[in-house]
């Protein structure tokens, strides 16, 4: 017993079974305090709940529980202030904090806290606590970004730009419609976080190393103390599963992809060739050698960091794919991808929101390009269909019109009445009624379309959905 305490003083939770300490090489490989210290506050919260569970089973007296909690509170304050930190000899956050507890409560009382729990159920629980907290932060920052995009959409209710497929001019659309198309994936990301929390809201505490405990501890008591709705149904699954972690990292990667797609457009729109936007000075950078440069660094970094987020997911899944039940030390490698994904999003999202909120759109340039590239060709084909021309024929006639215009350096509205008639008698002068981008946009008034009234309804629906999701998080 005393030998075990001696090893605990060194920041390790094992040792008596071994004749000597680990080699320096093993200690260096095994150490994790340089990254798992991020879980210190959650470890202390778990220790308080575990102490209460031990007291409920009679393993701590009321006085011992009070002394234990007081020591944990002092340790918590010292961790927060920086007065206590992990030492080089500490293997991980758990060992470091047990050392800190024993320094404050004494070896006899401090050494009792480990009864009935293992690092296996402990770490599985702490990661969920960490992720649930940070999921809330990420959700708030996602909402702020959606609000910034929606505000730009609301500020530009009539601006038209060329909609694109394959990066080619396709059909004119409202800028607001295009911007809102970037909001909905982010709303689904919010919904994914909310749905993920149903599975994360389960505590693995009480599973011990893998088989549970003989001490009669109540896992549900600890779960509720820590804010979980339930405890694990299976102690092996609780300690060994990391699908909840992988799911979170997937959501983070998906958010990164959604940001990256918008970032790519902002980068293009900011070029002189497009000329659709100007970045605010406070959200762009210059060049160390070219005085004229104004670079879209936030968009580029968001695009780059999406690859990092995808890499975190790929690395984590690769680590998990070959592990037999139950716990394996490989699972130590789940922390850094998780922490990195969280930290990346928590930095990228507010920067991206600020960039979007301060974008200045060049609506005249968008209006200039909107009818170009024969973007009204589909309107011509559908105008013919409304006159009972089979769509196959209408498609071919419109294709002939486009070829003629292209060969003669004309846009569709520049083709003369005589030239229309020469292409086909079906192309009467009335075809000009559909050769305006305003008319094209207004005519697409079906549900989900780009007509102004539909976009206004869409904006209201988006706002309601986001406010509902925000309210659910506050419950």
Swiss-Prot record:
CDD domains, per database record: Argininosuccinate_lyase (cd01359)
Enzyme class, first EC level, given as a word: lyase
Keyword check for Kinase: no
A GO cellular component annotation in the UniProt record: cytosol
GO biological process assignments: arginine biosynthetic process via ornithine; L-arginine biosynthetic process
Family named by the database record: Belongs to the lyase 1 family. Argininosuccinate lyase subfamily.
Record PANTHER family: ARGININOSUCCINATE LYASE
Name of the protein: Argininosuccinate lyase
Organism, as annotated: Leifsonia xyli subsp. xyli (strain CTCB07)
High-level lineage: Bacteria, Bacillati, Actinomycetota, Actinomycetes, Micrococcales
Originating gene: argH
